[in-house]
Structure formats: structure tokens, C-alpha cells
Curated annotation (Swiss-Prot):
Protein name per its UniProtKB record: Xaa-Pro dipeptidyl-peptidase
Any single Pfam family the record assigns to this protein: Peptidase_S15
Subcellular location: Cytoplasm
Thermoactivity: Optimum temperature is 46-50 degrees Celsius.
Family, per entry: Belongs to the peptidase S15 family.
Length: 792
């Protein structure tokens, strides 16, 4: 598998020498050393676990130069050069590869090519040797990290602890901060919101992890993770809403309104600055933050309103949620008051903060980055938003239907608010408990699970309407197989952000609701180090030009990443597919006639006692038990690999034998073959140290799995009663044909030669839609039905 490397910044030999000297890797007297002496010293310096020169020299005999000679013996002959094969053997061992197991000592160059390592060459001068070691320190090792990070995990940079300054290597920040003395503290930011109705601004607990060096004169930037889960998670999955119920006439919709909570203006910060008096007991929940904390970036967490030890109530997705999370940044930049404790007597400032703030986090944590960025708050320089919701309607609803996130059937805005209302665990907070109970009733009514329609309530929770306020640079990360936060969320915000006068990037990986910072196939953590150094430390390191605007992981070969200028339907050419009465999906033949299927609701699924995931695979694979409740059409085999891009569109002319109905459409890759695992395989657990004795991550990647019959590419759902307007329902008569036109979730998917494309038209999606208790007949008029794809 290829260890692709995008974060290496091309560097001149002169600059490389300066950087090697600065980190004490290249000795000051290097010019007086012979080639063999320099080779011994530089190799030994990689071995950070050996703390004396004698210990380092003693370990050289552990490394083979070829299948007959160890490095110590090789150096006894005082060589003045080393061949590409000899150096490759030493380098591969330094990078963590095992000779005779991972590669052959007689052919190390093949191993280097296999893993996409920089090419090895004959070295005949000290200058070449020095620069080659510079490149080696910046090369990804077997554990996925660059060799310099492996050395850091062994203690190399402890020699710089206490110096109180940032150090850089190849444009990235180095772990020179004393992680054994990280300051861990809690402060209480006062909000302008009074969501619990006690007449006082809500106090928002904020947890700070920062380098001890920031206690003196050093100002450090902050990485802020807005995490509603930080105070704890209330497990309420057993009380999720019932989805085994019949559909409701959507014309009962009343357009529920958003109602703002009262404001209580907080006092302006005074000159008082008392050190924090509460120690943090919470732990960082995000590995990238820990990695960068060792490199000088403070890590800040807050769940804001409704979180443990604080005031207020959770109001999922609301403007109040955005305001409260934004107020933490206002404290970091000196524009908002915070106190040492809940008595509100002593103010404390983020005097350690440089005023430059970046944001990190996945899912809800990524969502709040979007929300805060739209406010244009001062000090927020960049966001790295992973698997983020850009419209809460698109998370819990779709085209007039209640549609759950994957594996979250029955969850909704009220239930998520309860999950995050961790101050309910503070037994004495009776004010919050009373306000929470009232808010739960309001959320239940306003979210309108009966009709699933768009409303003012949902409009207030659509961040895409406020993108003009974004002033910070932008990175979005999303899984193309994320059926929790469906890809429409990132696709639609990307169409807005890419047009703004800010630097923006997009990463699309093959995962579900997952992080990508520790994949074999891409050096994402190094890219983020480079990015945050540029954005928060204001170092010109070429980060803006270092990698393509859009990077997309291939679904056939996980170690292939596609560089694109954009992610949109117009990357491809439009192709029209027409379903026919004999089950074909044709590009030439118009379908005629009508086909009918009977939806069984959730009755058979309940009897089967299988998981929603198992149902989906059996369904798309065509098992008769489930396939009979659908219409299925297959294309001819593709003669050449074909990539589908952007958002497919469907037009379906359909009639139901009831006055309500829901229609689902899925595109499926058909053909028995190996496909990538649904989640990455862990190659080595805990093998990527964040710093010296400071936690670790695990190397992982998608790999070929056992052969399967089919794979879901994309799908979508629609309420038949929205045939006239996606935002307003209409009456539906039994037997009335209506024309539904809607887009499926966006994709970037390659069908290999020999594969077939399947179109499935059905109704109940057991994992996402409501599961009616009654059967319903759906008749599709093929003459009014078509699929529009965009193909590369």
C-alpha cells in the first residue's frame, strides 16, 4: 500500500542544512567530519531512545547494509559513498520496516516503490548525505508518521523543553513543548443568553489544555473544539421515537416557528485577571488536538449551554446554540468576560492566547464550526470541519419525510438535546431541569414528526443561508459513505463556500461517519500541522499551494487519491437512463407501461429480527424476501471504468393506492467481487505517538474485504405529497399519478469494467424512513420515469 505524502514542502539544500542544525540533528562540526563519520552520527541521531553517543554507536550493528554486512562493520572500512540499495536498507529499517519480513535485503528498492517512498539514489558526497537525511526525517515511516514524529515519541525533542518558543521543520511545528506539565484548567464564560430563564446570563464552562510555556511570555494560538458531548452523554436511545407507525396526511402541517430566547447583556471585561482556580478533570476527545498541543497549540473544549457544571439548556441546532459557542471565542480574543468559578466574583482572561483561533472536530463538533464561522466572529482564522451538518433539516428530514441518520432510527432534535443536556447530572441545578422540561415539549411540537415538512423552525437551523458571514479559511472533510451525516450536507455547503473570497479545501474519503487523520494513504495530520502553522502562527510555509483544492479517495484502490478542482455534477457529462418494463436500465430505449409493487411497511422487517444494516445488504443484493417490495432495473455491464460524480437526479411518475405515500430510490453497484471494507482496518493499535509519553493514535486504512454481491452508491427519499412544492405539501388522492423530481445524495463513485448499475424504486427504508404498519401499492408509469447521471 502506498504511503502517499502531500505535506512535504520542497526545500533547498541550504535551508535543509539550517533546519537540521537548528534541531541539533546535524552537528555543528559537520564540515570537519568524513563521509563515514557523518553517516554514523546522522544514523545514530535518529535513534532517540539511545541518549549517549556510545549508546547510539553501539546500536549501529543492529542495522543491515546488505544481506552480509551490518552498518557498524560497513563503517569500519570508512566508506566515502553508499549505494542506493545500501542506503535504502538502512533507511527502511530506520522507518520501521523489518528486513526479511517486510522486504528483502537484496531488493530494498522494490519496497520503497511499493510504499511510494522517495526514490533512493547513490550518495557520493556529504552534501547529498545531509539532504537525503533531511528528506528521510520528513518521510512517512511504517507507522504512518514521518520519521521525525517517531523520534519525538522516543524523546528526541525533550532537549528543547523549557525554551518557551516554537520551532519549525519543513514548515511544520515541532513537539518542543513540555507535555509533562500541560496546564489543565476550567473557566466560566458569561453568555448574553438566558436560556434557563433565571434572569442571569448563562455561565458556560470552558476547559483549557495549554502548554506550560504559555504561563510566561509566550502567546499561543487556540484550537477550539465546540463539543456538546464534552460534559458527558445521557444514554436515551431506548426512549427514541417510535417509527413503526403509519404515515400522516402532511397537509396538517402548521409551519412551526422559531422563537428566540431572551438576552441578558453581560458586562464588558474589566482589567481584572485572576488565574483560573479550577482544575480540568475532563479529557481531550480529539487526537488531532493532542498532537498539536505537543506542538504549541492550546486545546479548548466547551459544550456551552446545557453542559455539565454550567447553566442553560440545549436547543439543538438553534441560533442560541451558535451564539453560546461563539462566545467562547470572544473570551479567547479578549472581548468577553469569564470567571474563575460560578460565584462570578473574579474575572479571568485568556491572556495566554495570541488571539488566533482555529476549530477542529467531527459530526456535531464539525457542525458547530460551520455555525460559528457564519457569524464572522473576530479571531476565528480557520475551520477544519469533519462530517458536519450544514442544515439540520437535511440531517433528520428529506424532501418532506422524517428520515433518520443511519443507525439512529427514532432520534430527533429533542432526543439529541437530551443526550447533550449533561447539567441534568448536576442534581442541584433545579433551574435548568425545569427549563429543560419546558424546552423538550417545545422541541417535540416544533420538529413536527407527524408531517416531516420544512418550516420556519428548520429554516432557522440552516447554516447555508448565512455563508456570506464567513471570513475564515475553510477545510471540509467528509466520508462518501457517511449515512449518518449524509453527503448532501457537505456538498451543499461546499457549493457556497467555494465561491467565497476565502481559501478553501475539501477532502472526501471512503469512510462512513469517521475521522481520516490516521489513514495509511494520506498524511492528513501533517497537512493540518502545515495548515495551522500558516493560519494561526502566520508562518509563510506554502500551505495554500501545497495540495489540490479537492482530494477524493478512490473506492476501488484505497491508496489512490484523485485531485480535482471541484466536486460538482458538472465534473461529468450528463447521461440519461430509462427503466424498461423488462427490468433494463437503458440509455436508448424509452420505457412504456406501468409496473406496481406492494410496500410491506415494517411488518416483515420486525418479524425477521435482523439489523437495519443486514436488511440493507440483503435488499440491495436482490434477496427475494425483500426485493419483492420494489422495482429493480439493471444496466448492461460497463465496458470501461466509469465514475459517477455530483448529484444524480430522478423523475418518477407514481401513484399510490392511499392518500399518503413515501418513495425511495437507490443506485447500486451490482456484481460479485471484493470491495473495500466499510470501516478502516487497524494495522497497529496505539502506534502513532502524539508526542513523548503523551498518548497515541492507531494506523488504519480501508482494505479489500470478502466478496459481496452489491454495494449502495447513493439513495434518496421523498414524500408524495410534496409533488408540487418541496416546502409545502398538497392533497393527494388515492390512485392519483404525480411527477416527483428530486436529487439523490451526491457521490464520487467508480464502477469498474464488468459492473452493472442498478436502480431500485421502493418505499419503506427500514433504516431511515418511518415503517408503516399497513401495506401500500405503488404504481410507476415508466414513460414518466428517468434517471439522470453525471459520468466522468
Amino acid at each position: 500500500m502506498k504511503y502517499n505524502q502531500y505535506a512535504y514542502v520542497e526545500t533547498s539544500p541550504e535551508k535543509a542544512t539550517e533546519e537540521l542544525l537548528a534541531i541539533n540533528f546535524l552537528p555543528e562540526n559537520y564540515s570537519s567530519l568524513s563521509f563515514s563519520e557523518l553517516l554514523a552520527v546522522l544514523t545514530g541521531n535518529v535513534l532517540a531512545e539511545a541518549t549517549t553517543r556510545q549508546a547510539k554507536d553501539a546500536k549501529l550493528a543492529e542495522f543491515a547494509v546488505d544481506d552480509q554486512t551490518d552498518l557498524a562493520a560497513f563503517l569500519l572500512d570508512t566508506p566515502t559513498a553508499i549505494t542506493a540499495s545500501q542506503f535504502a536498507n538502512v533507511a527502511l529499517q530506520l522507518l520501521g520496516y523489518h528486513p526479511n519480513y517486510d522486504y528483502s535485503l537484496t531488493d530494498p528498492l522494490t519496497c520503497g516503490k511499493k510504499h511510494a517512498l522517495p526514490a533512493f539514489k547513490d550518495l557520493t558526497s556529504k552534501e547529498e548525505l545531509i539532504f537525503t537525511f533531511y528528506r528521510l526525517l520528513n518521510t512517512r515511516s511504517k507507522n504512518g508518521q514521518i520519521l521525525l514524529d517517531v523520534m519525538a515519541g522516543k524523546g528526541y525533542f525533550t532537549q528543547f523543553w523549557g525554551e518557551g518558543k516554537f520551532m519549525f521543520f519543513n514548515g511544520k511545528s515541532l513537539p518542543v513543548f513540555d507535555t509533562s506539565q500541560v496546564i489543565r484548567e476550567v473557566v466560566y464564560v458569561q453568555s448574553d443568553l438566558d436560556t434557563d430563564g433565571d434572569g442571569k446570563g448563562d455561565l458556560l464552562p470552558v476547559t483549557v489544555f495549554r502548554p506550560v510555556e504559555s504561563q510566561d511570555q509566550l502567546k499561543v494560538p487556540a484550537l477550539y473544539t465546540a463539543s456538546p458531548y464534552f460534559g458527558g452523554i445521557i444514554d436515551n436511545v431506548k426512549t427514541n421515537h417510535n417509527v413503526d407507525e403509519n404515515l400522516t396526511d402532511a397537509t396538517t402541517w402548521t409551519n412551526p416557528k422559531y422563537v428566540a430566547k431572551p438576552l441578558v447583556k453581560s458586562p464588558a471585561p474589566s482589567d481584572q485577571d485572576v488565574p483560573a482556580t479550577e482544575l480540568a478533570t475532563g479529557q481531550s476527545s480529539y487526537g488531532l488536538n493532542e498532537y498539536l498541543l505537543a506542538r504549541g497549540f492550546a486545546s479548548v473544549f466547551s459544550g456551552a449551554i446545557g453542559n455539565r457544571h454550567g447553566d442553560g439548556i440545549r436547543i439543538t441546532g438553534s441560533p442560541e446554540e451558535t451564539i453560546s459557542q461563539k462566545e467562547v471565542i470572544e473570551w479567547l480574543t479578549g472581548d468577553r468576560v469569564a470567571y474563575t468559578d460560578r460565584t462570578r466574583r473574579f474575572e479571568t482572561k485568556a491572556s495566554w492566547c495570541s488571539g488566533n483561533v482555529g476549530m477542529t472536530g467531527r459530526s456535531y463538533l464539525g457542525t458547530l464550526q460551520i455555525a460559528i464561522a457564519t457569524t464572522g466572529v473576530k479571531g476565528l482564522k480557520t475551520v477544519v470541519s469533519e462530517a458536519a451538518i450544514s442544515s439540520w433539516y437535511d440531517y433528520y428530514r428529506e424532501h418532506g419525510l422524517v428520515v433518520a441518520p443511519s443507525e439512529c432510527q427514532g432520534e430527533d432534535m429533542d432526543k439529541l438535546a437530551e443526550v447533550c443536556q449533561s447539567n441534568l447530572w448536576d442534581g442541584g441545578n433545579f433551574t435548568a431541569k425545569k427549563a429543560y422540561e419546558a424546552e423538550q415539549a417545545e422541541l417535540l411540537a416544533a420538529q413536527d414528526r407527524a408531517t416531516g415538512q420544512y418550516s420556519d423552525f428548520w429554516e432557522s437551523r440552516n447554516y447555508r443561508h448565512h455563508t456570506d458571514g464567513i471570513k475564515c479559511s475553510w477545510i471540509s472533510v467528509h466520508g462518501l459513505n457517511d449515512w449518518n451525516v449524509k453527503p448532501k450536507n457537505v456538498y451543499k455547503i461546499w457549493q457556497k463556500v467555494k465561491q467565497l473570497p476565502v481559501k478553501s479545501h475539501l477532502f472526501l474519503h471512503q469512510g462512513p461517519h469517521y475521522n481520516m487523520n490516521n489513514l495509511v494513504s494520506i498524511d492528513f495530520t501533517d497537512l493540518m500541522n502545515l495548515w495551522f502553522v500558516h493560519e494561526l502562527l502566520e508562518v509563510e510555509n506554502g500551505a495554500y499551494e501545497q495540495w489540490p483544492k479537492v482530494m477524493i479517495q478512490d473506492n476501488l484502490e484505497a491508496d489512490e487519491w484523485h485531485a480535482e478542482s471541484d466536486w460538482a455534477s458538472d465534473l461529468g457529462q450528463a447521461s440519461l437512463y430509462l427503466p424498461t418494463a423488462d427490468g433494463d436500465l437503458s440509455t436508448v430505449e424509452n420505457g412504456t407501461g406501468q409496473l406496481t409493487f406492494t410496500d410491506l411497511g415494517g411488518t416483515e422487517f420486525k418479524k425477521a429480527g435482523i439489523s437495519e444494516t443486514d436488511w440493507e445488504y440483503q435488499f440491495i443484493s436482490g434477496e427475494e424476501k425483500w426485493a419483492k417490495a420494489s422495482l429493480r432495473f439493471e444496466s448492461e455491464e460497463f465496458l470501461h471504468p466509469t465514475t459517477l460524480v455530483g448529484r444524480p437526479k430522478v423523475r418518477v411518475r407514481v401513484a399510490a393506492n392511499k392518500t399518503v405515500g413515501q418513495l425511495s430510490v437507490a443506485l447500486v453497484d451490482l456484481g460479485t467481487r471484493q470491495r473495500l471494507t466499510a470501516t478502516p482496518k487497524i494495522f497497529a493499535r496505539g502506534n502513532q505517538p502524539f508526542g513523548y509519553r503523551f498518548g497515541a493514535d492507531s494506523l488504519q486504512e480501508f482494505v479489500p474485504d470478502k466478496a459481496t454481491k452489491a454495494k449502495l452508491i447513493t439513495k434518496a427519499h421523498m414524500n408524495l405529497q410534496n409533488y408540487q412544492d418541496m416546502k409545502q405539501p398538497s392533497k393527494l388522492e388515492a390512485g392519483q399519478f404525480v411527477d416527483l423530481e428530486f436529487e439523490l445524495q451526491p457521490t464520487y463513485y467508480t464502477l469498474p469494467a464488468g459492473a452493472k448499475l442498478g436502480l431500485i424504486i421502493y418505499s419503506t427504508d427500514q433504516g431511515m424512513t418511518k415503517r408503516p404498519l399497513e401495506t401500500e401499492d405503488y404504481t410507476v408509469d415508466l414513460a414518466g420515469t428517468a434517471l439522470l447521471l453525471y459520468r466522468k
